[in-house]
Amino acid sequence: MKYFILAQILFLTCLVGFAQQVMLADSITKNPVSYATVYDAKGNVIGRSDMGGYVNLQKGHEYHISHIGYAAKSFVYNDESIIFLSPSSYIIPGVKVTAKKKKYYHCKVFFRSIEHVDSCLKYYMDGIREFYIDTKSKKVHCGNVVTNYFMSKRKDIAQKKRSMMIGDKYMALPFPDKNTLYEETMRDKKRNIESGIVYADSISIGSCEVYPDKNEMLLSIDALWPRNALVTNLFGYTQVLSKHNKTELYRCDEFHAPSVFNLKSANSYRHLTLTHKKENIVRDIDVEDVFYVVEFKYTDTKELSSSNVLQEDYKKYSGMFPVIERIREQLVREE
């Protein structure tokens, strides 16, 4: 009898620690939310929801969810089969387009780039950057930028000695592509959007959600398709890019396809593995880059913003798009 009781206790203990598959869904449409980033109580990245919105969570554990199209959510998982996320909304202070077409589209973006190494937070960067985009050619011209660099306070992460000479910083400054994901999708004869699903050669590679009440569109794709991985070899090092997800949020209407001039925010997530053929070292690296368009106007001249103006913009907009506290409290400014 005592062995039976012991077996039951062990069984229940295993259940408590067992990761359960949970769907992340839109609180209004009830549709799955793909490519949301999930952090644990320490701010370590534990994964991303897949194209079906699924992610593995453990009962009784604290989690934090981040997605450019939804309000951040923090909670303790209690055995729910669906976790609902509320769509976020922010208004961009923009200047209306006049009858005369201007030469440039001038926009400012608030951005952040977060890098985890072996699931632990290591590097963080954020700031404000401005762009001038030619309204005819859509060529992107970079303006001024204000950037802040941070790294982990943890000495075992920040000060870890590496025998590998190659750097492990994969963070990147924001730079909008000439064409949006939507435009690239519609131009590719192998791709199409049907019933909210992005298909490539009849294979589901992403999702497309339209919000008529907000005149917005959210498009997410697997940017690696048709590859399963991208392998790069250099000086004995092997870098494997095994995940690359992209998401873009647009202001849209029924008359125009979403272009770079309608882009509201963008997210790019990469998972890489770094190894060396002569060293017994493996680095798992997760990098998430995100930016939000916070101001825009159309103009005929390129008048770059001063450093003081961008610093004030940073103070204003970093409060609008705060990073989760579990990440912020781990950071120290990089010297």
For every predicted segment, state its role.
Residues 1-23:
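Bacterial Sec-dependent N-terminal signal peptides
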Residues 20-29, 53, 95:
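A short, amphipathic beta-strand motif
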Residues 28-42:
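Short, ordered, surface-exposed loop/turn motifs in non-cytosolic proteins
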Residues 30-33, 54-62:
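Short Pro-Gly-centered beta-turn/loop motif in secreted/extracellular proteins
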Residues 44-52:
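Short, acidic Ser/Thr/Gly-rich low-complexity loop/linker segments typical of extracellular
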